[in-house]
Regions:
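Residue-level recognition of single "structural anchor" positions
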Residues: 1-157
């Protein structure tokens, strides 16, 4: 199951849309920055998701933007689409770390720079997003230690 959402980001005074897909565990599947928020933009985002994963999800959860329905019917007709109120909170909340990073960087300077940063940030976020509420303290500490070990190996390489 994927939770999909889009949010606007201003880059040099122009409005761009950051499309984000989050899985049922809260891990970021993909982020994609586009200038538009129409059906064609949604189809591009869906094609990108399908290319990276190879299969379509059983269900997608979105807000009530009509572009999602058009893209789903065209590219993933067998996938169930839910756009119930509050069902998309997982994707809505996944924008918060991005907004914090955006403020820290004093906004993005170009769409290309924003896409590079957001793609890398999603990978790092998934690595350190350990779902603490699902584990005991001892297991959480073990997973965190393993995560930092992998991070140190990746950074040292």
């Amino acid at each position: 199951m994927w939770h999909l959402d889009e949010v606007f980001v201003k880059i040099r005074g122009e409005r761009h849309y950051l499309w984000r897909a989050v899985d049922q565990d809260g891990d970021v599947v993909d982020v994609y920055l586009q200038a538009r928020r129409n059906a064609e933009a949604a189809k591009r985002f869906f094609r990108r998701l399908l290319r990276s994963h190879g299969t379509s999800p059983r269900k997608i959860v979105t807000d009530k933007l009509g572009s999602y329905g058009v893209a789903r019917r065209a590219l993933m007709p067998e996938t169930i689409h839910s756009n119930d109120r509050y069902a998309n909170n997982r994707a809505e909340l996944s924008h918060q770390p991005t907004r914090a990073r955006e403020r820290g960087m004093r906004r993005f300077s170009s769409p290309e720079q924003a896409q590079r940063f957001l793609s890398a940030h999603a990978v790092v976020y998934n690595l350190f997003n350990l779902q603490r509420h699902l584990a005991s303290a001892a297991f959480y500490r073990l997973r965190r230690a393993r995560t930092f070990k992998h991070w140190n190996e990746a950074v040292a390489a």
